[in-house]
Amino acid sequence: MDGPFAEPTNTREAILGAAFRALRKHGYASVTIQRIGDEFDKSPSLVYHHYDGKDDLLVDLMGFLLDEFEASISDSGDPPPVGGGDSQPVDESAPERSARDELDIYLTAAVDPASLDGAYAPDAQFVTVMTELRAQAANDEAYREHFDRSDRVFGEYLERLVREAAAETEAPDGHAAGASPPSVPVEEVVATLQTFATGGMFRWTTTNGGAWVDDSRAGIDGYLERVLPLVETDEAD
């Protein structure tokens, strides 16, 4: 499975493609430069020429994938298939998904990725690998800097979705006394969703599932139903 590296345009992309395949096959702990070289159709020595070690290469791989994601949402507003899984071609005749639908996909991908199908379903093995990589940020500054940037990129994407979903939602009725409920900053909602997703991914990859999946989704869905009508939809100047 090559994902976004099916047709590399240069040596860097070919090496990153080899790293992508090796990482999915072996996982973070067992992947080595040698195993990455085994997936490379040129001399493995080129890998050592371009990168100081495994982590240097994997951080560059994550940066490339994040660049691809950022470009895709800038161009079309829709994210690409996560991890380049065996996804189906996008059905152009299918109804356009609402912002709320996109939020549902994002949240489900975090706590139950295997339940999704279709063109934008995440690849469950890739989700596991990304969780392994995020764990490296606890002790490695290069990984930490990458995930700081990743959180910013996904946060901007979610902010747009939350604003659009809020605009699609009917405003709440005023209280009996005539006062409207206080508004909720969009940044607060985005931070809540990102924290839910990050924690959900870690729990999904490190447990055998259970009632917590449905219970957590019910909880976050209830939160969104309550909070979306209160979100400030106007962007700050």
Residue ranges of predicted features:
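Short loop-to-helix capping motifs
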Residues: 136-141
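Hydrophobic/aromatic residues within well-ordered alpha-helical segments
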Residues: 11, 54, 61, 65, ...
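N-terminal intrinsically disordered/low-complexity leader segments
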Residues: 1-10, 80-91, 171-180, 232-237
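An amphipathic alpha-helix signature
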Residues: 16, 155-159, 163, 190, ...
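Hydrophobic alpha-helical connector segments
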Residues: 60, 74-127, 186-193
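Extracellular/lumenal glycan-associated context and N-glycosylation machinery
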Residues: 128-131, 169
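Helix-turn-helix
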Residues: 3, 8-14, 18-64
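Hydrophobic/aromatic-rich alpha-helical bundle segments in the mid-to-C-terminal region
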Residues: 142-148, 152, 167-237
